[in-house]
């Protein structure tokens, strides 16, 4: 980002061939760019709402600025699911069928009830309270800042309350994502029931290619979980001042 920021600052004075035409952003820092004049409104490229009728709304929300102007497009969304340990599901719930398992995690209150069942049989429901934060936070209905005041959404407070209750009950831990303790549940002896993530998590980050892991022999199932969410994705933004606007438009529509 540092190189991109420095180059964008010089965009107006750069020779035509040295100007940035487009750049990519991720959801976690998209607003840093789309809420500035360094990115072009999509409509200024000649892309109409009808061209975007099949895009999921959240992929547009991520790159919509504070004035409601769409400033980017995505070809790669990463919707998430609940990945569950099939053997743990059979042991505690009596089934590893995705539709049946979904009944035990269909909302947060039911999820919490199931956590107690898991704990009684020696399993953690999730590896860490940090596993669920993204799911709760993707489903807020208000902004973090309201005028000059910090606002804490009700769904964030529910995450706080639910997380504390699970930790107090010994149903989960507080380790950081990507830590060694967090990844112990990738193996049977870690005794973790579920993780939340998109396809890239189970394919590339849960030791699926390591013999002895749960994923190595297809031991993870997938259910919708308590709430829909996403984690990751890539968005294309057009840089203000590009001299190749038509090409940027074509790339966006093609992707």
Task: Give, region by region, the residue ranges found by the protein language model.
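Short helix-initiation/N-cap motifs at beta->coil->alpha
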Residues: 1-10, 105-110, 174-188
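Extracytoplasmic "Venus flytrap"/periplasmic binding protein-like
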Residues: 1-55, 69, 91-92, 184-186, ...
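Solvent-exposed loop/turn segments at secondary-structure junctions
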Residues: 2, 27-32, 78-81, 88-89, ...
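Extracellular/periplasmic catalytic domains that process cell-envelope and extracellular macromolecules
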Residues: 14-18, 33-35, 63-67, 74-76, ...
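Structural recognition of the beta-strand scaffold that forms the well-ordered cores
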Residues: 21-25, 72-75, 81-83, 125-128, ...
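Helix-loop-helix "hinge/cap" segment bordering the ligand-binding cleft or interdomain interface
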Residues: 43-53, 61-132, 144-177, 240-246
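Periplasmic-binding protein-like
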Residues: 86-88, 252-255
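Extracytoplasmic/periplasmic substrate-binding proteins
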Residues: 158-250
